[in-house]
Design a protein with these regions (language model features):
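Von Willebrand factor
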Residues: 350-415, 420-466, 494-504, 525-526
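Ligand-binding pocket segment of bilobal, Venus flytrap-like solute-binding proteins
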Residues: 178-252
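Acidic, polar low-complexity linker/tail segments
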Residues: 23-26, 303-356, 363-371
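VWA/integrin I-like adhesion module and closely mimicked acidic/polar interface patches used
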Residues: 245, 467-518, 528-530
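C-terminal motif of bacterial Sec signal peptides marking the signal peptidase cleavage site
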Residues: 17-20
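Periplasmic-binding protein-like
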Residues: 111-119, 192-199, 206, 243-270, ...
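N-terminal segment of the mature folded domain
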Residues: 24-159
C-alpha cells in the first residue's frame, strides 16, 4: 500500500507524453572505458547525482550515456518495449514504468533512493503560520493560500512527477484519507471544489521540478514557497545559505504526503554483456558506501524512508527536515483511477491557462519548417491529438494565435475547449504561407491588449514564441510595452528553430522569467514541452 504512490507520476506523463515530462535532451558520455555501453534514460531529477552514476559505470567497466527526459516522454519511450534505443531507465517514480511498460520489457527494478514531495516555505512565513510547531494538513495550506498569506509555485500534475505527487496528496486529503482513492472519491463535489480552489491558488507553474527550483532562486522575492522534492528543497537551501538569504522550512502534509522512489530498471533485450554491466551498476548504487553518499546529497536511502544517521547539515532539523519522524505516504490508486484523476486535473481542476502562440511565417520558414510548425499547432489545438500528451484544454482555457513575418499578420482567439472552434483556429494557421522578413517583438506587443482583457491572476498565462531567424525590431519596445501593460511577470517561452538568434531569445527569457526550448530536432516536441509549462 505504501509505495504505489510513486507510480502516479507515471500515469501522468503517460497520458501526457508532454513537455513537463518532456525531454531535456542532454546526452552525456561517460569516462574513458572501452567496455559495454549502457544508454540510460533518466528523469532530470538525477542530474545532480550523475557523477555517482558515471562512477558506477566505471566500476562496472562500462560506458554510461545518459539522456534526460521528462516523465511523460520516459513513459512513451517505454511503450516501445524492447524496441527502445535505451538499455536502462531511471524515472522519478516507478509509476512511469508501470504506465509505459505495457510489454513488461523492464526487468530487475530497484529503488535507488526516495524523496518525499514537500512544501518548502520561507521559515519566517512558516513561523507566522504556526507550521514550525504544529502538524500541517492540506486544508491548512489551502486556507493560507486563500487568505493571501502564501504565494507558492508548483509543477503541472500532467507534466511533472512532483506536481502529480502533490496533486494526489491533495485528492487524498480532501477525500477524507481513504485507504485507497477510488473513482467515486473523484466524483464527490466537495473533493473537486477544494482541489480546484487549491490549484487555483498556485501562483506559478512549470513543467520541470529542477527548473522550478531555479526559478524560485531567481525570483526569490516574489514567492513564499514551492512544492518540490525534499532533495530539491535541500539543494535550494544550500544555494540560499550561500547567497545569505532566508532558507526554506520543509512542511510535510500529514494527510497528503507522497514519496518518489527513483527506480532503476533494465530494458531487457537479451544482451548478456549489457545485462551483466547493468547488474554491476545497480549493485554498486545499492552498496552501503554509495547509499551513504546519496544520503549525504539529500536522498533518503535504504529499504524504507528512514534517514537516521544522516548528516544534519544536509537533513537539517532546524529547517523542518526531521529524520526521526516516521513518514506515512499515501497509497497509489489503481491505474484507471490515476488516469481519471489526471484527466480531471487537465480538463476540470487545474487553473485555466491563457496561452498566446506567436508563430514565425517569415520567408525562411518555407518548405518543411512551415509544415512542421503547422503540424505542431495541430497537436496543440486538435483535442484528439492533445489527449495523448495530456494537453487537453479546459472549458475556461484561452488560446490566442498571432502569426507574423516582418509584421503582425492577425490576432485570433478561442475561449474554451470546443473542438470545432479550435480546429477552425488551426485551419486559419494552416492557410498561412511563409514570406517576408522577421520581427519577433511586434507580434508579442500586438497580443498584449487581448491578454489584458482577462484577469491575469485567474490564469496561468504565457506566450509561446516560435522563430527561425534573427529578428529585426526593438526589444526595448517590447520591454516598455510589457511594463505599460503590467505584464512583466508573464513568461515568454521561446522555441528556437533554424537560424534563430539565441542571444535575442535568451534576453527575452531572462526579462520575463521564461525559458528557451530548442526545436531544431523536433519542433512538435518543443511545442509540447513549452505548453507543459502553463
Amino acid at each position: 500500500m505504501v509505495k504505489r504512490l510513486l507510480s502516479l507520476a507515471l500515469v501522468l506523463c503517460a497520458a501526457l507524453g508532454l513537455s513537463a515530462c518532456k525531454p531535456e535532451e542532454n546526452d552525456k558520455a561517460a569516462s574513458n572505458n572501452s567496455g559495454t555501453e549502457i544508454r540510460l534514460l533518466s528523469g532530470s531529477e538525477n542530474k545532480s547525482i550523475e557523477p555517482i552514476l558515471q562512477e558506477a559505470a566505471r566500476q562496472a567497466g562500462a560506458t554510461l550515456k545518459v539522456t534526460y527526459k521528462g516523465s511523460v516522454d520516459i513513459m512513451l519511450e517505454l511503450e516501445k518495449g524492447k524496441s527502445s534505443e535505451y538499455d536502462a531507465v531511471m524515472p522519478a517514480d516507478r509509476m512511469w514504468i508501470t504506465l509505459g511498460d505495457k510489454t513488461r520489457a523492464v526487468k530487475n527494478i530497484a529503488s535507488i533512493y526516495r524523496s518525499p514531495v514537500v512544501f518548502g516555505v520561507k521559515r519566517s512565513v512558516a513561523e507566522k503560520l504556526g507550521w514550525t510547531k504544529n502538524e500541517v494538513k492540506v486544508a491548512d495550506i489551502l486556507k493560507a493560500a486563500q487568505d493571501g498569506k502564501l504565494r507558492f509555485m508548483m509543477t503541472s500534475a500532467t507534466q511533472s512527477n512532483s506536481g502529480a505527487a502533490a496533486y494526489f496528496g491533495f485528492l487524498y486529503a480532501f477525500a477524507g484519507n481513504p485507504e485507497v482513492l477510488s473513482e467515486s472519491d473523484l466524483d464527490k463535489p466537495q473533493v473537486g471544489d477544494k482541489v480546484k480552489t487549491i490549484l487555483g491558488s498556485v501562483n506559478r507553474t512549470a513543467g520541470s521540478s529542477g527548473w522550478l527550483k531555479d526559478l524560485f532562486l531567481d525570483r526569490y522575492d516574489y514567492f513564499d514557497a514551492m512544492v518540490n522534492y525534499e532533495s530539491m528543497i535541500i539543494e535550494t537551501n544550500q544555494a540560499l545559505v550561500q547567497q545569505g538569504r532566508e532558507p526554506l522550512y520543509a512542511v510535510y502534509p500529514v494527510d497528503g504526503l507522497a514519496i518518489a522512489d527513483a527506480p532503476l530498471g533494465l530494458v531487457a533485450k537479451g544482451d548478456p554483456a549489457k545485462d551483466a554491466a547493468f547488474a554491476k551498476i545497480q549493485d554498486y548504487l545499492l552498496s552501503a558506501p554509495v547509499q551513504n553518499q546519496l544520503l549525504n546529497q539529500g536522498r533518503r536511502t535504504g529499504l524504507g524512508v528512514n534517514a537516521s544517521g544522516a548528516n544534519q547539515t544536509v537533513f537539517n532539523p532546524a529547517l523542518g527536515i526531521d529524520i526521526n519522524k516516521v513518514l506515512t505516504p499515501i497509497t497509489m490508486p489503481a491505474p484507471e483511477v490515476i488516469e481519471k484523476a489526471l484527466t480531471l486535473y487537465q480538463t476540470a481542476f487545474r487553473k485555466p491557462s491563457l496561452t498566446v502562440f506567436v508563430l514565425d511565417f517569415s520567408g525562411s520558414m518555407a518548405g518543411s519548417a512551415e509544415e512542421e510548425l503547422k503540424n505542431a499547432m495541430r497537436v496543440m489545438l486538435d483535442q484528439s491529438l492533445a489527449k495523448r500528451y495530456m494537453l487537453q484544454a479546459s472549458p475556461k482555457d484561452v488560446f490566442i494565435v498571432v502569426p507574423f513575418d516582418s509584421q503582425t499578420r492577425w490576432v485570433k482567439k478561442v475561449e474554451g475547449n470546443d473542438q470545432n472552434k479550435l480546429m477552425e483556429l488551426w485551419q486559419a494557421v494552416a492557410r498561412e504561407k511563409a514570406n517576408n522578413g522577421t520581427d519577433i517583438y511586434s507580434p508579442v506587443i500586438a497580443a498584449l491588449p487581448e491578454i489584458r482583457k482577462y484577469n491575469y491572476e485567474n490564469y496561468s498565462t504565457s506566450v509561446i514564441l516560435m522563430t527561425d531567424g534573427k529578428s529585426e525590431g526593438s526589444f526595448d519596445n517590447l520591454k516598455q510595452s510589457l511594463a505599460a501593460q503590467a505584464l512583466t511577470g508573464m513568461p515568454v517561452y521561446s522555441i528556437m528553430f533554424g537560424a534563430a538568434d539565441p542571444s535575442q531569445l535568451n534576453a527575452i527569457a531572462v526579462f520575463t522569467t521564461g525559458k528557451v526550448f530548442n526545436g531544431s530536432k523536433d519542433l512538435i516536441s518543443a511545442f509540447r514541452e513549452a505548453k507543459g509549462y502553463n
